[in-house]
Curated annotation (Swiss-Prot):
One function term, GO molecular function aspect: zinc ion binding
The reaction(s) this protein catalyses: hydrogencarbonate + H(+) = CO2 + H2O
Purpose: Reversible hydration of carbon dioxide.
Domain spans labelled Alpha-carbonic anhydrase: 5-262
Sequence positions that bind substrate: 201-202
Gene name in the database record: Ca7
The name this protein goes by in its record: Carbonic anhydrase 7
Amino acid sequence: MTGHHCWGYGQDDGPSNWHKLYPIAQGDRQSPINIISSQAVYSPSLQPLELFYEACMSLSITNNGHSVQVDFNDSDDRTVVSGGPLEGPYRLKQLHFHWGKKRDMGSEHTVDGKSFPSELHLVHWNAKKYSTFGEAAAAPDGLAVVGVFLETGDEHPSMNRLTDALYMVRFKDTKAQFSCFNPKCLLPTSRHYWTYPGSLTTPPLSESVTWIVLREPIRISERQMEKFRSLLFTSEDDERIHMVDNFRPPQPLKGRVVKASFQA
């Protein structure tokens, strides 16, 4: 087995074993973390978070065997995050989700020990400083990931466009065209956030991420959530294993400070 297929979320290839192939898994700025809201430091110097997302920059939707991912055209600065803790704009490369088998777990970050059923990650890279996503992903200030918690409740009308496309990528390594999806529709009303220096939450676990975790969750219906759970970790020819519990548990903070853009 080669490349990204030598890790997963099972008993033998799951997060507790990743350090064998990726020693950085035990590094000093690993993600996700449990955000202890009372210990987050309000930082008035933090800028407001600005998300400039153009409507028609999405390209495709893919089941990569670990999650479902939407890729974006990142050839220019039309779809970026800026402000917040960031110096300059970071371009949106892709978004993906993590979710659980049941509604009491699924998110990667937790808040005061509480898990959410799912977490959306919007992955951006520093194109002002680095020439490729790969180069940025290896640099300490290369990536900015915006995390959004999902909870179940009312249906999220804008999410239907995405959940209705999931049947096309049910199996691992399947891909479909997915154009003109604006991820702005998946953001909560409030832009309050926590931020801290961290890592990718999947191998190679590079410590290259400025994390921006939005405080306010978005809501989707249980029916919409079930469509994520109907995806498969496996290819069409393999025994079917449902794609659930594809999250890494919280990692030690190791002295890092979590900053808050708001006063608790």
